[in-house]
Amino acid sequence: MAAAFGCVCFDGGLCVAVVVRRPEDECLGGPKRHVRLWVLGAVVCLPIFAIFCRFGGAFHSDDGVPWESAARTRYVVLNEAVLDDGQALYRAYITHKRAKSRANRPISDEELKQAVVCLGGDPKTDSLDAAFSRQSQAEALAKRPRHVVVILGENYALWPLLPEYRSLGLAQTGEWLEKEGAYTYHFLSNGNGTMTSLNGFLTGLPDVGLYVNYTMGLKGKASPFAIGETMKRLGYRTVFWYGGLRSWQDLEHFTLREGFDEFHCADELPEQGESSSWGAPDGALFDVIQERMQKESEDTFYFILTTSNHPPFAYDVDAKGFPRVEVTEKLPPSIPRDKATIDQLGHIWYADQVMGKFIREVKKDDPSTLFVVTGDHAERFNFATDVSLWAQSGVPCYFYGEGVPKDLLQGAAGSHLQIAPTLAELIAPQGTTYTSLLLPLMQSKRAFNHRLFIENGEIGEEKALSNAEFNKEIEAARTVARWMVQQDR
């Protein structure tokens, strides 16, 4: 960004120098032709070169070198500055502005107390852990699952499961889970990007506009609402698997600070012969995880973050069986027909297929395994026409396993933050104490995230929410989150 701006200014100056000539230049016969050609070449080439540098050695962000992959220091701004000084400085400025204006606004004891009351917590306790202590009310699964698996699918969106797109067959695993397990499609991700959504799982807190993965847990204590902490209290060893690089967003250190015993990623996988700049193929990731699961002897919780359904969409999905011609013939007017779009659809199909294969095979190995499947976000697919908010921003949520009632989530609406308490309700005997900021899904009829809400079966933007009570609850949850970020517990 800074490079492009500098080149524009430089080119503008050159243009002025060419057009506004001194009188003595005329007397001397004007600038020589080759000088003008050099100036013209600079005017044309420098902006192109600046754009090439701006996107990490390409003319589009999907094809360039991601700054995460070029990380060489412990500091995000310095890593990004290797490829783009302007973008790095802009990110630092915006983060600082958010921190000063919203997240780090002073919160009084009285304001925090009112927020706790609004969310149904106990204001008389001396900690938020105790304030939001809950007792499981649901009947636990007849058999405690030895393995619990949460799959957070990269861009695993709701839209391929909507009636107008279902005939494309891009989410056959989702359709199967819909029939075999419990599900809700009235569901929201915690954010509009992978890290903001992942922060919700790893802290149990709603998004407040900060990258808390760099700040929380540094004092040695995990968030009591974190999914890793919740599962550890339920007696599980906690393991995080990521299909990308460990340097991305300081993910390894953050997961280990927030309740996970182990962290594994793509650099532990055998050579695949193909990869993208974003990570290893989901199929290879699932294969390695299944092998590890077969060797486990203790109760273990696996959190899996996939990567294949992400730019640059470079896998040979046709070789993996993607029915390109059939899908193209069925495309509705709202989906473009260019090759890049069809390639992206192929990656949606591939990620869904290998996830389904993994679930079925693990289920054969251990029938007691409990699965949760959802997407980290939607909002990454470019439709050709305007579509509904459900198609643009919705993600599905499935619970599948031995003894899970198919009507478990009937009528429910919720978000990522409510998966951890739902697991506690399913696994722990009635009356067991657990900690959660929000209600479990089976007790929830509405939801919110950073900008959207679901109420009475409808989705909308928060700025249009007229329910004052619901608005108050949303702000109360964010107040608790801001306070925890400030205190870092």
Task: Name each model-derived stretch.
Residues 1-146, 163, 168-171, 178-181, ...:
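N-terminal secretory/membrane-targeting segments
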Residues 120-489:
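Solvent-exposed soluble domains appended to multi-pass membrane proteins
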